Design a protein with these regions (language model features):
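Transmembrane signal-anchor helices characteristic of membrane glycosylation enzymes that use polyprenol
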Residues: 6-36, 222-238
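Transmembrane-helix signature of polytopic, membrane-embedded enzymes
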Residues: 7-13, 104-127
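Extracytosolic helix-loop segments that constitute the early lumenal/periplasmic catalytic or substrate-binding loops
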Residues: 20-24, 38-62, 69-72, 76, ...
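Transmembrane-lumen/periplasm boundary regions of multi-pass, lipid-linked membrane glycan transferases
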Residues: 39-45, 179, 183, 188-306, ...
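Short acidic/glycine- and proline-prone juxtamembrane loop motifs at membrane-interface regions
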Residues: 86-89, 133-144, 185
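Transmembrane-helix motifs of polytopic, lipid-linked glycan transferases
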Residues: 91-112, 150
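Membrane-interface transmembrane helices that cradle and orient dolichyl/undecaprenyl
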Residues: 110-115, 151-170, 180, 350-354
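Membrane-embedded architecture of ER/inner-membrane glycosylation machinery
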Residues: 171, 299-443
Length: 443
């Protein structure tokens, strides 16, 4: 056993993780994506108009940049704009993220037979920087990841009952995928149904006749139902032609156009190459990137002895990677829905993973904490913007930074505590970042 994960570790890191996701949730400088600002603008304008549809915007070309579900959620959470705060806009995103973590916990705990493993999977996923960056702000990613993941969690949780279900599971999966499409894009039905097809095919022991006769209609039913839910946007919007032009043609079809001179050259070189897609997908793990790499290496070494669940998780990752390597715009953000699967793999291999991935994570955390402390200390001692005392930290901030630094150092030199501290260190770094940026809030 290499650094087993105890309930004491789990409870401490769980409390730390919950605190981390709510700490600074209303900050203007929280890690996020630039899409949040136009999304907030659409919510405000639509709420002021007093109607759910059409979506409103004063910015050219972004009125129908995304389906309406996330904007409707923003309208509800802010009380039609009456409670216009970042916290009111963002807390539904955190709720979606925590629900995804909860159902990931249930699925992994069920098929592994260990609640510690399930809890570890949820905590690892929450520790990924991409989860923290995209799972807190007012963005489309939290509901998209939740609704896309739910059917796959159900297959892992119920196993045979879900795979053999002739109608109930396909109907529920279709509704879940439909909600995901209504949150992000109809394009996600392609990787989702491709992954489901691979799941069914493997369940039938790679027999093409069996999967065609027993499961093909299920995948078709799921796809049709999901697209039907998405099509409600066209039915309810008084200007469906604008939705078609701005969203279907502008936002989605344009992603297949070559970014430079040649689609196939873009595929193998440059910033939108398939290699960059692989790299940015790994980088979604943030400080745990090398832990993820060591997990994939371990899975390759044990490829002849993989369990059913491990194979299904890898098939899910491969399906999304293959599909999203086809558009000319390739980004690891498109593969956020498979990060829970990769977190589950890390949790399942946790006790067998080598130390080097965790030690690199701890060294990266040490660098982050040292950089934040150095920059913050210099700003506090300097006359920021020509006025002394503007950039000030409390003793609590420096006490927290000292504690975090000491804990990470302990993890580097203690083999027994290395893995658990590396996981906790991710959340400590996020808290340190938020605390270090607090003077920008004017407090």
């Amino acid at each position: 056993m290499r650094g087993s994960f105890t309930y004491r570790n789990a409870i401490f890191i769980l409390l730390l993780g919950v605190f981390t996701y709510f700490y600074g949730l209303d900050s203007r400088f929280a890690p996020k994506n630039g899409d949040e600002y136009p999304y907030m603008h659409i919510v405000r304008m639509t709420a002021d108009a007093g109607a759910w549809l059409p979506l409103q915007s004063e910015m050219d070309g972004i009125k129908n940049t995304k389906p309406p579900l996330v904007f409707w959620e923003g309208i509800v959470s802010t009380g039609w704009g009456s409670d216009w705060t970042l916290f009111a806009l963002r807390w539904p995103s955190v709720l979606y993220t925590f629900l995804t973590a909860f159902f990931l916990f249930l699925a992994v705990a069920r098929y592994s037979g260990k609640k510690q493993t399930g809890l570890l999977a949820a905590l690892v996923w929450l520790s990924f920087f991409a989860t923290y960056r995209y799972g807190r702000p007012f963005l489309t990613d939290p509901p998209e990841v939740f609704w896309l993941s739910l059917p796959f969690f159900a297959l892992l949780y119920w196993g045979r009952a879900a795979f053999e279900s002739k109608l109930l599971f396909p109907l529920l999966a279709g509704l879940c995928f439909g909600m995901a499409l209504l949150s992000k894009s109809f394009a996600y039905i392609v990787p989702a149904t491709f992954a489901l097809g691979l799941f069914y095919w493997h369940w039938r022991e790679w027999s093409i006749p069996k999967v065609l006769l027993q499961d093909l209609y299920k995948v078709i039913l799921i796809a049709v139902l999901a697209l039907g839910v998405f099509a409600l946007w066209f039915v309810l919007d008084p200007f469906p032609e604008a939705v078609w032009k701005e969203f279907v043609l502008g936002e989605n079809a344009g992603k297949f156009e070559a970014r430079s001179s040649n689609y196939f050259l873009d595929l193998v070189r440059g910033g939108d190459s398939i290699w960059m897609l692989a790299l940015t997908t790994l980088a979604n793990a943030g400080l745990f990137t090398f832990v993820l790499i060591s997990t994939l290496i371990q899975a390759w070494r044990e490829r002849r002895f993989l369990s059913l669940e491990e194979i299904l998780l890898l098939l899910l990752v491969c399906a999304f990677f293959i599909v999203f390597s086809l558009p000319s715009q390739r980004s690891g953000r498109y593969l956020l829905p498979v990060m829970p699967a990769l977190a589950a793999l890390i949790a399942m291999y946790w006790d067998r993973l080598p130390w080097w991935g965790f030690r690199i994570a701890l060294l990266l955390q040490l660098v982050v904490l040292a950089a934040l402390a150095w920059v913050g200390g210099n700003l506090q001692l300097s006359n920021f913007l020509g006025q002394p005392g503007i950039w000030n930290y409390s003793f609590l901030h420096w006490g927290f930074m000292t504690f975090s630094f000491a804990l990470v150092l302990l993890g580097i030199f203690s083999r027994e505590r290395c893995k658990a501290i590396a996981l906790a260190g991710c959340f400590l770094c996020y808290c340190a970042l938020t605390s270090s940026l607090s003077p920008l809030e004017g407090s």
